Amino acid sequence: VSELSPPEFPGGTSTGLAVLEAVAAGVGAVVLDGKPLGFSALRRLSAGVDAAVIDETALAAVAAARTAFEEALASGALVYGANTGVGAMKDWTPSPEDLARFNADLVLAHAFGVGTPLSVPVTRLALAIRANTMLAGHTGSTPDLARRLVAWLNAGLTPVLRPVGSLGTADIGLMGQVGAALAGDGEAMLAGETLPALEAMSRAGLQPFECGVKDSLAALSSNAAGVALSTAAIGRAAGTLRTLMATGLAAAAAAGSLPAPALAATVLGTPRQAEIGRWIDTARTDSAVPPGHRLHDPLSLRMMPQVFAAAVDAVEAAGRVAVADTARNDDNPVVLGGAVLSSGGSLPLDLTLAVEGATLALAHLARNAMNRCILIVNGRLVGLPVNLVAPGTTMTGFGPVLKLAGELFARVRHLAVPVSTEPLTVADGMEDEATFLPLAVDNLSRALDALDLLAALEALIAAAAFDVAGLKPNGLAGCVHAAVRRLAEPHQRDRRLSLEIEAIAADLASPERIAELAKAAPLTDFDNFFAIFDLA
């Protein structure tokens, strides 16, 4: 994580000067201007390799919205969460002398998340996304709040953010921990050490932030944590998908798949199916493994263009929604045209449905991979004996491990069940909608854990099939075979597979291996959108 001190990049100097300062310090810069952040920028921000710089024009819009907000308060208007309570307390108005205390304590009342803290990279994303959505200029908070979030980023300072406690209609229980830490309450991470927030800020050269009216609500009433979790999980899903496409292609080549279905998809399929058909045809030809001698392929081979295309469509669609949400203002109230208005923008239903859709599409991909594993091991394909046990060899072979494939698929399928429709009403009936976005993302992340293992198992089975058939694949299939053989010797007798499968899974899920597999058989637009090649 970058250890830049806050004064170097406070976001308060001119944008161009701040970028030049970043370059002079030997780091890059990501400009936060209230516009969507792509996956390359998100990855650099999460890793702390680039400084975050506030665009001055965007900051001026924040200041203008703040002026309009203060004018509304000065007129005597009641403004939700500023001079009134929140939730079921919306009709309560604190006295003028209690207003400062009310705002200071508001973040504490909402700092109730529990569970294992989020990783530093994801927490950094939450800070960056909250700052960026403020910079759209509709929040009504002080410019200093956006500056302070960016100062934390550039100091390598992150709040300890426990992730359980959001209904997905503004992550108040999660982001409340951010607001509390900014004020000096709670814990923070600095240089890998968990410290009391006050001590961490002192070491980083920062002072506690005193929330002005609306600053407390702006700090906590945001889906920034859910969007951060979403971008991280969807970005990971893109890599896992590319790995599963590679292992699926290798398994298909080992099974002697026929070229006709991919060619048919290039002409008769949807645009995405046609693209995937071309991808399969090219990668399959590059493998230099001859097709089988049969009339018809089983569906798990024949329908790969359709299954792969659906997964690519779903994951890319989720990624595009997530990127848009890195700039979408989800505050309530909001400032529009100088007026303070109530808003329902804190319901990220489009993103939640996109995440759930991606998980469901990946469940279909999991079934497809499991079925290919079964197909190869069953011994019904010419040249591939039962359990991949070569004649004259004393082995049980790969039959038993198919039970692992079955459970991994079942886990993914179970996690693909939607959670966003769960009914719930809180806050004395005022809050009767929910998306459970963080829970939906957690399901996707756990599904990806299972999918990484399933990809490893399919790769191991494909490699064994190549070996028993005496085939030496080239191209993408050859990359998969080589990746397996770096970690697991060919099977000459039965042995424990647990550690091998886990090691192969870790290798195939590594950024470097994902980039290598993608370069061997590019899916150019998809790979560029998700910055897959940046992983190398």
State where each predicted segment sits:
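Acidic, glycine-rich active-site loops and adjacent beta-strand->loop/helix elements
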Residues: V86, F112-G113, N132-T133, L153, ...
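Conserved SET/PR-domain catalytic core that frames the SAM/AdoMet-binding pocket
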Residues: G76-L78
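FAD-binding core of FAD-dependent oxidoreductases
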Residues: Y80-D105, A109-M134, V160-A183, E193, ...
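C-terminal auxiliary extensions adjacent to catalytic cores
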Residues: E3-D50, I54-A61, A65-L73, L99, ...
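Short alpha-helical scaffolding segments that buttress acidic/His motifs in well-ordered protein cores
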Residues: L42, L106, H110, V122, ...
